[in-house]
Structure formats: structure tokens, C-alpha cells
Amino acid sequence: MQYELRLVEFDDVLPVWQNKLWPGRQSPIKPMSSMTLDRQYDMSIYDNYEPFFWAVYHNNEIVAVNSGHQTNATEFRSRGLYADPAHRGKGLAKMLLNELLVCAEAVGCNLVWTVPRKGSEHAYLSAGFVFLGGWFNEGMEFGPNIYSVCYI
């Protein structure tokens, strides 16, 4: 199968997030999040950084997405990783995460972090992420989740 990775816009990934990754989500889906790795919230993220969005296409249809943005000068967050079940196991998540790692390094970050959902462990481990602490549900609409980091 032919897959094409593209840098896209928020409006391209939003329908996938709304309908497939976070169906029925109560909180608004924004291009970025104010969450930080130390489990705090920093509203200045919205003013200081720009988000990046990627999609993997197959036959001109989006089959996988991810996004990322800085949360401070040296840390970059991966957010919204999703691969269509019919296309899982083909390395698409790893492709997206590797592209995100390249982007994070290009903007001067040395650490990428994320809060993956249970069931997606393999994708993150295959891209070099390690898990921090244990699984939790508190504060998450779609848990359980775990903090995870990858050092660049």
C-alpha cells in the first residue's frame, strides 16, 4: 500500500479527532493544549508557540494523524495520534512520531512528551518513548492514560 505523509492544517485533522479519536468529547477540541509535562497548565503556550499537524494519506483519504507543539523552550508535546484500525500495524504511528521528533529537534527541543491512551503503548515504545509513573484517569475524558517521554 502507498502512504503519503503530509504537513496539514488543524481543519484537516479536526474531523478525525472529533469522529474517531475523541467521539462525544465534552471539552472543546483546540489546536493546542495548555497541559505541561509537570501536570500543570500554562496558558502562555497559546501565545508563545505554533502547532504542527500531520496526516498520512492512502488513496487521497486521511488514515492517520498527529499533531505537536512546544510547551516550553525545550519540550514539545505530541497530541492526537490516531491511526484508522484498517491501517494499524503498518508503521503509520511510528512514521508520524518520527516526523514529530524531527520537527521538535528543528525548533530546539530536546524532549518530546505525550499522554497516550492505554492500548497505544506499542506505537510509542517503537518510536523510542518511555513511560513515566503509572496509568491514571483523573482529569482525562478518554483514559486511562500515562505520561511518556522521548529524549532527542
Summary of predicted features, one role per range:
Residues 70-81, 88, 140-141:
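A conserved beta-turn-beta hairpin within the catalytic core of GNAT-like acetyltransferases
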Residues 17, 124-125, 129:
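Conserved active-site tyrosine of GNAT-family acetyltransferases
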Residues 17-53, 57-58:
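Active-site rim helix/loop that mediates acceptor-substrate recognition in acyltransferases
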Residues 104-117:
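Conserved GNAT acetyl-CoA-binding A-motif
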Residues 1-11, 152:
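Conserved N-terminal entry element of GNAT/NAT acetyltransferase domains
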Residues 55, 61-69, 77-82:
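Conserved beta-strand in the GNAT
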Residues 113-115, 130-150:
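Conserved catalytic-core motifs of GNAT/GCN5-like acyltransferases
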Residues 83, 89-102:
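Conserved acetyl-CoA-binding loop-helix of GNAT-fold acetyltransferases
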